[in-house]
Amino acid sequence: AVVREAAGRGHSVTSYSRRTPEQPVDGVAYVNGSLLDSELLAKTVEDADVVFETISPRGDMEGRLEEIVDQLIRLADDAGVRLGVLGGVSSVLVSEGGPRFFDVSQPEPEVLPEIKTGLALLEALQESPETLDWFYVSPAATFGAWYPQQVTGEYRISDDVLLTDEQGESHISGADLAKAIVDEIEQPKYHRRRFHAAH
């Protein structure tokens, strides 16, 4: 969704993934390979203004994404490239000054490794060199291909506190999250900070 949104706004976009999607976006350059390959990873920052990482820490990426992002931090800092990371909602506070979503949500054991990776990535960015311009995106609690949401063309932003609707639910569609991300790329407001986006 981020690739489609950015390309639709006229940006030059290169997508790095294991395989080209079944429905490629017109005008996007697709590079196939594994980002566990250090040489391929290094290419992501070449001729780039912004690198945005959206890798899921599942399958053979479980336990490896921290290593990839550590390398991206070094590569982006050396190249003077802005680095964005798509994380999770677990580090967001449920209320001002309150506990993290992770501390009160009682996640299923099978998703704990993914959650802990998201927390570790934010910590790695926070500990990165001051010269690196980064941003970390925490989507709403209900987000993903398995949670289809209405596309509204709108979103709300919070620094650290969970955003919910009138029913107390936190959700966002992939397309609207992509809009929030590309808006931040075009008009940066969150330098070395996280933001949370929801409907």
Residue ranges and their predicted role:
Residues 21-79:
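NAD(P)H-binding glycine-rich loop region in Rossmannoid oxidoreductase-like domains
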Residues 1-26, 37-38, 59-61, 79-84, ...:
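Oxidoreductase cofactor-interface core, primarily capturing Rossmann-like NAD(P)-dependent enzymes
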